[in-house]
């Protein structure tokens, strides 16, 4: 029987009720964190002379044994509700209630689970950041390799202006940079301690909340006990960051799918990330990119579900909060898997430089620079130049002739003169790109500068990540060994 029910509640729980209410399926994510929390709390109880050193050391020794054998070695009886009671029941079985039953003094499962979630989530966030840094490094290498590879950029999915493929890759690096920063920002709000808040009103025991905060490597305390046990905003913030990252990554998937079609044919996805058809032998389908695109969409649903669960809950702890965790962990599983797949696809793509250049040379992608050249060389207003070049494009399309064959006549009709050299330069995609060397532009030298700038940022991210990981490792080493 559940050790919690024998007092106030006389009867045992029906089996279907047990299965309905247990959280053990996803408690695997907080198993080690719960043991860390137990050890830190017990250590503090001994130091405060609330629990004897003799009893406390026995509890800690047994907790370390449980950590080594793992969760699957325990009696995962759903009648025990959750991993907290599974571990406590195991301790009581080994040490007796007079010893093990003292571990929970001055604590509630409410502040315990709130602490466990933060301990586990901070590690997941760092795992995500590590994968993003690795992916960013691979993307920067690709961008540098293609700093001079001419391609065409799109607006409204219509050809717009020539750019470099390196510049296009850096657009995704730039988004990932912001994602990394968001996760680091969220980490500061995840890594705060609710331990000691009790059920919702702290405790009458002389506990030392700052001591457990230090033992567990938290930055600071959540001081208000009611907020401490009820706050799950750190989960919402993390899931929102994951959803935003998922949206950014879905753009990469979409570009891989689109640009690998025969109509674009500018990139080819490696065979290991594709499939073929059961009936059409010629097919090379971008299955991994498509599945990633779909999986990334589920992140938004998980976020909205959690927000809906939390909306208008009475203050402090409610069991509804238990149903948040599965959606949180599912989102972390999904984003981690998708980062790995997308990094693999981007790192192994074949780039068709000839096709990219061919696309950039047709369909009037250089029209903007032609208008700009008129402004610079003929000293006319841009809006006037815009109209003249627009007329030139329309005439070219309607009469099915090349711009170069009619350009002089159109300019002459508008009282303008431009040398052949200037015209050829304006219509050359590479010359177009070279001119756009302002900060953030697609010019090769600006792409190379941006790559170095992003690498410097990446080094700072790596240092920040390593510092945080070492801090967590030190906590685990201190408490578990």
Curated annotation (Swiss-Prot):
Its main location: cytoplasm. One of its GO terms (molecular function) is argininosuccinate lyase activity. Pathway: Amino-acid biosynthesis; L-arginine biosynthesis; L-arginine from L-ornithine and carbamoyl phosphate: step 3/3. It comes from the Archaea. The keyword Lyase applies. The keyword Cytoplasm applies. InterPro entries: Arg_succ_lyase_C, Argininosuccinate_lyase, Fumarase/histidase_N, Fumarate_lyase_fam, Fumarate_lyase_N, L-Aspartase-like. Keywords: Amino-acid biosynthesis, Arginine biosynthesis, Cytoplasm, Lyase. Its EC number is 4.3.2.1. One of its GO terms (biological process) is arginine biosynthetic process via ornithine. One of its GO terms (cellular component) is cytosol. It catalyses: 2-(N(omega)-L-arginino)succinate = fumarate + L-arginine. It is found in: Cytoplasm. PANTHER family: ARGININOSUCCINATE LYASE. Belongs to the lyase 1 family. Argininosuccinate lyase subfamily. This is Argininosuccinate lyase. It comes from Methanococcus vannielii (strain ATCC 35089 / DSM 1224 / JCM 13029 / OCM 148 / SB). The gene is argH.
